[in-house]
Swiss-Prot record:
Protein name according to UniProt: Large ribosomal subunit protein bL32
One cellular component term from this protein's GO annotations in UniProt: large ribosomal subunit
Organism: Staphylococcus epidermidis (strain ATCC 35984 / DSM 28319 / BCRC 17069 / CCUG 31568 / BM 3577 / RP62A)
InterPro entries given in the database record: Ribosomal_bL32, Ribosomal_bL32_bact, Ribosomal_zn-bd
Keyword presence, Ribonucleoprotein: yes
The keyword Ribonucleoprotein is assigned to this record: yes
Similarity-based family: Belongs to the bacterial ribosomal protein bL32 family.
Species classification: Bacteria, Bacillati, Bacillota, Bacilli, Bacillales
Length: 57
């Protein structure tokens, strides 16, 4: 079996893991009510999407 010859240093480990990060979700302001919502999704506050009321409240 393959066994590491040297211990992996903290620096080398951290450099390898630079791309393992959580991305921030794209938040936009709802043009209807002004609340922040996720992009390309129905607004939870007023139920509108793309200027039309999709979910009645």
């Amino acid at each position: 079996m393959a066994v590491p010859k040297r211990r992996t240093s903290k620096t080398r480990k951290n450099k390898r893991r630079t791309h393992f990060k959580i991305s921030v979700p794209g938040m936009t302001e709802c043009p209807n009510c002004g609340e922040y919502k996720l992009s390309h999704r129905v607004c939870k506050n007023c139920g509108s999407y793309n200027g039309e009321e999709v979910v009645s409240k």
